[in-house]
From Swiss-Prot:
GO terms for molecular function: dUTP diphosphatase activity; magnesium ion binding. This is Deoxyuridine 5'-triphosphate nucleotidohydrolase. GO terms for biological process: dUMP biosynthetic process; dUTP catabolic process. It comes from Mycolicibacterium gilvum (strain PYR-GCK). It catalyses: dUTP + H2O = dUMP + diphosphate + H(+). Pathway: Pyrimidine metabolism; dUMP biosynthesis; dUMP from dCTP (dUTP route): step 2/2. The keyword Metal-binding applies.
Length: 154
């Protein structure tokens, strides 16, 4: 099943988001400006496009794995969220995770990828306890960060 996605090209000199290979989940987003990121620096980078995510779906902005592995370029709030009601330009909050080498991003470079997925929109129902709501206890309970172990330091 194929869903269409309305895309407005805000910068006519940049390519539309595109898949590198047939069947890829994400479409590449391009930088609309030149950016220099020093070690540890971050910048909000425009992509020159706006999209209309359909109701009941969400756009998720992910780092490009090759850039993360090769030069340490990532996204601060990964994945970034593009809600169905948002109609502005997609911007990506990039960060240079390398501690010693600056990263130069050129206008037109692929900087991130957009995935569009269906999302549940549950109605929130306040309860005083999970027992009252008829929700069974779990073996995890309220165990949070590090509660499952799996690393020598935990």
């Amino acid at each position: 099943m194929s869903t269409s996605l309305a895309v407005v090209r805000l910068d006519p000199d940049l390519p539309l988001p595109s898949r590198a290979h047939d069947g890829d989940a994400g479409v590449d987003l391009y930088s609309a400006q030149d950016v220099e990121l020093g070690p540890g620096e971050r910048a909000l980078v425009p992509t020159g496009v706006a999209v209309a995510i359909p109701h009941g779906m969400v756009g998720l902005i992910h780092p490009r794995s090759g850039l993360a592995a090769r030069v340490g370029l990532s996204i601060v709030n990964t994945p970034g969220t593009v809600d169905a009601g948002y109609r502005g330009e997609i911007k990506v909050c990039l960060i240079n995770l390398d501690t010693s080498t600056p990263i130069t991003i050129g206008r037109g470079d692929r900087i991130a990828q957009l995935l569009v997925q269906r999302v549940e929109l549950p109605e929130l129902v306040e309860v005083t306890s999970f027992d009252e709501a008829g929700l069974a206890d779990t073996t995890r309970g309220d165990g949070g960060y590090g509660s499952s172990g799996g690393h020598a330091s935990l």
